[in-house]
Amino acid sequence: MLGSIACSMEFEDFDLYSYFYGLVKQIPEGYVTTYGDLAQALGDPIAARAVGYMLSINEDPDTIPCYRVVLHDGTVGNYTHPLGPMEKVRRLRADGIPVVDGMIENFDRYRFRDFKTDQPLRKMQQYQEYIARKYSESGAGEFRTVAAFDVSYEERRAFASMVIQDGSTIEAYVISDGINFPYIPGYLAFREFRFIKKLYRKADLLLIDGNGILHPRFAGLATHAGVLLDRASIGVAKHLTRSTRHQDIIYMQDRPVGVMIRKNMIVSPGNFIDVNGSADTVRKMWNDRYPWPLKLAHQLSTRHAETGGRVSEYSIESAHELH
DNA sequence: GCGACAG
DNA sequence: ATCTTGTCGC
Ligand SMILES: [Mg+2]
């Protein structure tokens, strides 16, 4: 029964930006809060930097009072404005907050933390635990068709690509759509999975830029996608995080979850494959020490982001050249 | 003070 | 990821 509840809430359309700006509006005039307190109200203190980022791209500073968000040590912090933090100080003083030398006097007295929130990131963590339970390490081991995915970004727009190899045939697809979730460490799947789902065509293996079970809750983007699309999947990341390494094997809480197959290339199983199988599979499909479908997907999405998505036909021919 | 924080 | 308003632990 709990499983069926989880199935009905994949969070793909959840707009964290709107939810977040709603929280910022709760800060009363004459009070301040911190980036960390807002992150806690979202459900996880690790989101503090994402809070700063979302404030920085706020398009409506007249109704969303960014300037009431300050650093944990009582200094006012940054502000995107021609006048910079000076303008932040001016607005705080206009609210009656005493600021001396960029520091709020009697900080505790003015601090607001009583947000009305249901901490959405907590429910998302629970959903990740459900995804992790669905991971299976056994599968076919041989894959005829491979689909590789990557996503590039502007502030509120994403350009996502998929490159499919079926024997000697290569097809490439690009889509563009708005973004409803910022990058938050540990929550990448809630930002990127919906683009992968939209692009997805039947393939035996999904190759994904990010981690699989190499994740604090064993449910990185590649596992999230593999489980929800019921496909074999592998995560390929450039940076190692939140784990320990002995030789080239990566561990999380003493469980092997990935392999460093070279500097700046970490492979972890997403679904229907194990740690060694995922590393062997990626090693078989690289060209110049990089799995070529992923490289192509990366180039496709970045190129489309740079040109604003205008028809810059980066075509099948160049795909063949790279292969 | 410096590094960690998947993209 | 892009070029950017954090926080915590060592
Ligand atoms: Mg990427």
From Swiss-Prot:
Keyword Metal-binding carried by entry: yes
GO terms assigned for molecular function: deoxyribonuclease V activity; metal ion binding; methyltransferase activity; RNA endonuclease activity, producing 5'-phosphomonoesters; single-stranded RNA binding
Keywords: Cytoplasm, DNA damage, DNA repair, Endonuclease, Hydrolase, Magnesium, Metal-binding, Methyltransferase, Multifunctional enzyme, Nuclease, Transferase
Cofactor list: Mg(2+)
UniProt-annotated catalytic positions: 66
Domain of life assignment: Archaea
Chain positions covered by the region annotation Endonuclease V: 92-323
Pfam families per UniProt: DNA_binding_1, Endonuclease_5
Probable methylated-DNA--protein-cysteine methyltransferase as annotated region, ranges: 1-91
InterPro entries: Endonuclease-V, MethylDNA_cys_MeTrfase_DNA-bd, MethylDNA_cys_MeTrfase_DNAb, WH-like_DNA-bd_sf
CDD domains xref list: ATase, Endonuclease_V
Transmembrane feature ranges: none
Residues of the site described as Interaction with target DNA: 183
Homology family: In the N-terminal section; belongs to the MGMT family. In the C-terminal section; belongs to the endonuclease V family.
PANTHER family: ENDONUCLEASE V (PTHR28511:SF1)
Chain's role: DNA repair enzyme involved in the repair of deaminated bases. Selectively cleaves double-stranded DNA at the second phosphodiester bond 3' to a deoxyinosine leaving behind the intact lesion on the nicked DNA.
Name by which UniProt lists this protein: Bifunctional methyltransferase/endonuclease
Biological source species: Thermoplasma acidophilum (strain ATCC 25905 / DSM 1728 / JCM 9062 / NBRC 15155 / AMRC-C165)
